[in-house]
A protein has these predicted regions:
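Bacterial N-terminal signal peptides that target proteins for export
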Residues: 1-10
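Carbohydrate-active catalytic/glycan-binding domains of CAZyme proteins
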Residues: 22-122
Length: 122
C-alpha cells in the first residue's frame, strides 16, 4: 500500500511538468452561448447571446456578420421546411422578484444577410 501511494504521488508530481499551458481563445471571432451550427446556401451560421453571430465558408474559419435582431440570450436555429426558425430567451430580473422569462421566435427564408429574401418575421 505504501509503495502504491508513493507511486501515485510520483506520477502526480511528474505530471505537472508535462501539462501544456492552457490559454484563452485569442483573436477573432468570439461568440457567447453559440447556437447549433446550421448550413444555409453553402455557408455555415451560428448565433450568440446579445444578437449577431458568425458565418463560415468551410465550417472551420469563422467571421462576424451573421444577423439576428432582438438581443436576448442562448439562441438556437433550426431549419423547418424551407425556412429557418430562430428561438432565443429573454429574462427580466432584479431584486424585486420580477424574474419573468420569455422565449421569442423569429422566422427567415435565408440566413444570408446579403440575400434579397433576408428578413425576419415573428
Amino acid at each position: 500500500m505504501i509503495v502504491r501511494n508513493k507511486w501515485i504521488g510520483a506520477v502526480a508530481f511528474m505530471s505537472a511538468f508535462f501539462v501544456d499551458t492552457v490559454v484563452a481563445q485569442v483573436g477573432k471571432p468570439f461568440i457567447h452561448d453559440p447556437s447549433t451550427i446550421v448550413e444555409c446556401e453553402g455557408k455555415y451560421y451560428t448565433f450568440g447571446t446579445g444578437g449577431g453571430g458568425l458565418i463560415s465558408e468551410d465550417g472551420w474559419t469563422w467571421n462576424s456578420g451573421a444577423v439576428r435582431p432582438g438581443g436576448g440570450a442562448a439562441p438556437d436555429v433550426v431549419r423547418i421546411g424551407d425556412r429557418y426558425l430562430v428561438a432565443y430567451g429573454a429574462t427580466g430580473g432584479g431584486l424585486g422578484g420580477g424574474h419573468n422569462g420569455v422565449i421569442y421566435t423569429m422566422w427567415n427564408k435565408t440566413l444570408d444577410p446579403q440575400s434579397p429574401d433576408f428578413g425576419y418575421s415573428e
